[in-house]
Regions:
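Generic alpha-helical secondary structure signal
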Residues: 1-5, 23, 189, 196, ...
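A short acidic/small-residue loop/turn micro-motif
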Residues: 136, 147-154
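C-terminal domain-tail junction helix/linker
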Residues: 14, 195-199, 221-293
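Mobile genetic element proteins and their domesticated derivatives, centered on retroelements
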Residues: 6, 28, 43, 62, ...
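Mobile-element integrase/transposase regions
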Residues: 56-133, 158-162, 166-167, 172-174, ...
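Basic, flexible linker segments flanking DNA-binding modules
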Residues: 3-104, 208, 264-273
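RNase H-like polynucleotidyl transferase catalytic core
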Residues: 76-81, 177-181, 195-214, 230-235
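Acidic/histidine-rich, metal-coordinating catalytic segments
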Residues: 170-187, 205, 209, 259-264
Length: 293
């Protein structure tokens, strides 16, 4: 190989590397418009699924490109509690603590979180609206949601009815609805909708957030990833942002708990789903089941 050919090869390699790097940056920014807080690993998995070998980038190189261009995410956490379990309404036992779902529409989980809305007239400069989410425990698909100005049970009921509309026609299998013991979920109206649709209520038995960890986790994903860095000045803005976020989450975001499928894909499956993280809870449930035989 001549010196000229050698340098030409290096120039071509460098040009190609820079071109792919810019391609990755544009891709990451495009996805982040829909999911502002999505992490590097999930971004890389979406990238790998969408593009051919010609644009292939390894995970470590992908992370390095994000880092070099200031596209890493700084995490924000923590929301105040929206649960008031100090009431005299009937509550129900935890029916899911020893169950690993093996099909869609076996267990639904629900929780409520808050989202800030800027308000110059408010004492603190902002007010809150509230988001109810109902998610399938097997597929991780968000089936129902509602953005509301208050914590009244009527708003959570609308999220529940949205989820119920997704059930297949003639559905008759056992379905459990699991939540905390908040007044919304314990209200007579909410329980009646469950009963009218042959859905069995299940509730946490203590104030331990781990008892409803799955629902609290999806709320964190919506707030700290899908809506990351966004500010809102109206309830309508929050509604539109959540609507787009839920659509992206269900149809495009791969999930480590469902073998890197999207929730929409997993909702069409059955059988035990491979996790890409270790679940001590599931280990304990399986061990208990074996000892009972």
């Amino acid at each position: 190989m001549t010196r000229q050919a050698f340098y030409k090869r290096d120039e071509d390699f460098l040009f190609r590397r820079l071109a792919i790097e810019q391609f990755v940056v544009q891709f990451a920014r495009g996805v982040r418009e829909q999911d502002p807080g999505i992490g590097a690993d999930n971004l890389w998995r979406i990238y790998r699924e969408r593009f051919s070998e010609e644009y292939r980038v390894g995970r470590d190189a992908f992370r390095d490109i994000l880092h070099e261009h200031g596209l890493n995410i700084r995490r924000r956490f923590r929301a105040p509690r929206t649960t008031d379990s100090r009431h005299s309404l009937p509550t129900y036992p935890n029916l899911v603590k020893n169950v690993i779902p093996t099909r869609p529409n076996q267990i639904w989980v629900s929780d409520i979180t808050y989202i800030a809305i800027e308000d110059s007239e408010a004492r603190l400069g902002y007010t809150f609206c509230f988001l109810t989410i109902i998610m399938d425990a097997y597929s991780k698909k968000i089936l129902g949601w509602r953005v509301a100005p208050t914590l009244e049970a009527a708003h959570s009921i609308k999220a529940l009815k949205m989820a119920i509309k997704t059930l297949p026609e003639g559905f008759s299998e056992t379905l459990i609805h699991h939540s905390d013991r908040g007044t919304q979920y314990a209200s007579a109206d909410y329980i009646k909708v469950l009963a009218d649709n042959n859905i069995t209520p299940s509730m946490t038995e203590s104030g331990n957030p781990k008892d409803n960890a799955m629902a609290e986790r999806i709320n964190s994903t919506v707030k700290n990833e899908l809506l990351y860095g966004k500010t809102f000045s109206s309830l309508r803005q929050v509604f539109e942002a959540v609507r787009k976020a839920v659509g992206f989450y269900n149809s495009e975001r791969p999930h480590s708990s469902i073998d890197w499928h999207t929730p929409d894909e997993a909702h069409q499956m059955q059988g035990e789903m491979k996790r890409h993280w270790h679940s001590w809870r599931e280990d304990a449930i399986k061990k208990q089941a074996m000892e009972a035989v």
